[in-house]
Amino acid sequence: LLTLLLAGCGEGKDCKPNNFRKAAGAAARALHKAKAQKAVLAAPILLNAERSKNLQALVEGLYLGAYTFNRFKSEAKQAPLCEAAVLSAVPEAAAIITAAEISAEAVCYARDLVNNPGNVVTPQTMAEDALKLGQELPLEITIMDETLMEARGMHALLAVGQGSHNPPCLVALRYNGNGDAPYTAFVGKGITFDSGGISIKPDDNMGEMKDD
């Protein structure tokens, strides 16, 4: 049984990459609802000035729209969309699709971290996940425990960590790629459970405390 699904992306030249991302996401959710496990996407209107960006956004949207989190369900109600082919006239399509897959998989990984409850994702499990990434990717990983952070004078972080029975840690990832390239540093907040601070969260927002 074949199902034809049409997803609007806007009008012609006004279409931006995010239009394609949203349309593909909506299509993936509709296919999931229809219990489709395989799909073929035809995207003839990608051929404009931003065709490469549009194609990447389309694939990202398809991945993200098909995302489900069933870890704590005894039985998933529907099988997720697991295979899709994209028909495109963009010459560099293969490389673009690969980049989109990497980007979307990273987003889905972050979604998994957020969707897990605070008693599952702790500073220790975050550190363990970082170690796994270091084994799969060319990364140098340093994990600082309470003793090392105390020696480094990281008293603010340690003070915040005292609010939990799970001890804090700090993860540093280093990628040594092109040695001649400028040095770039990213600092990200990875609080696994944020119960307040100077702005106490009301009960309506308690479900978002694990989102940081």
Predicted regions and their residues:
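Acidic/histidine-rich catalytic neighborhood of metal-dependent amide-processing enzymes
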Residues: I200-D212
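Short amphipathic alpha-helical segment within the helicase RecA-like ATPase core
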Residues: L1-G190, S195, E208
